[in-house]
């Protein structure tokens, strides 16, 4: 049986050997076009990947442009809302509320809070620390029952309206702004005759802060509300106190320093509250002491 298979195997092997060059040649001819095909497929894959990355980037930039104010403003309700502690500003397009502590006399204090602050919570402490002042704490649009939506321009208009209304009965007005509100305060002080200006955890511009947080985004083209405090600081002529937190995790010290340098010479002074953060600065005794040194003279 095995001997009968030998001639058959020999014939098969011989046939295969004779056809091997043809098959090799065939393989060679078939394989030559495969390199351009693979290269073309790779190019298309890379191009698709680049297009996808660009599309995602543009989508993110578009989302940031349209939803940026939801990343800046975080409206809070008012905790202190009794009728005798609130003033209504009737603006052209909405109504804006102000938490107040009325006091007769020439002195008044207007306060602008942070981007997620319920300013009414400051009333008890402000009333105790500054007993001779009538107090006016502005609720930004969308905050504390105020109508409308917040924006830099709208808040600036509300601040001017509040100042003009308060000035009718209080000729000596001090302005205090904290965090985001420091930008509101310095802009107002450049346009109205304030008595003193205090800026708590202030910044040179919101654009600078946003550019550091989103270095991959063309912030200078997308940002709507820039809060360019440094630009307005150059026009301030009244005594100004800047209070920085020693361990501020939101506002970099160099931003506050650049703001200080934009004030005219001998107008502003910077003090650093020790062992304090961006949100805890008002828990330190120096915060109240240094503000009192300015306001309670």
Please annotate each region the language model reported.
Residues 236, 242-244, 248:
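Short beta-strand/loop motif that positions the catalytic acidic residue
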Residues 97-165:
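Membrane-embedded segments
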Residues 270-276:
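Short glycine-rich catalytic loops that host catalytic nucleophiles or stabilize transition states
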Residues 252-261:
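Short alpha-helix in the alpha/beta-hydrolase fold that links the catalytic acid
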Residues 177-181, 185:
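Gly/Ala-rich beta-loop-alpha elbow adjacent to hydrolase catalytic centers
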Residues 199-208:
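Active-site nucleophile loop of the alpha/beta-hydrolase fold
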Residues 49-89:
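An N-terminal hydrophobic leader/cap segment in hydrolases
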Residues 276-285:
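Catalytic histidine-centered segment of alpha/beta-hydrolase-like enzymes
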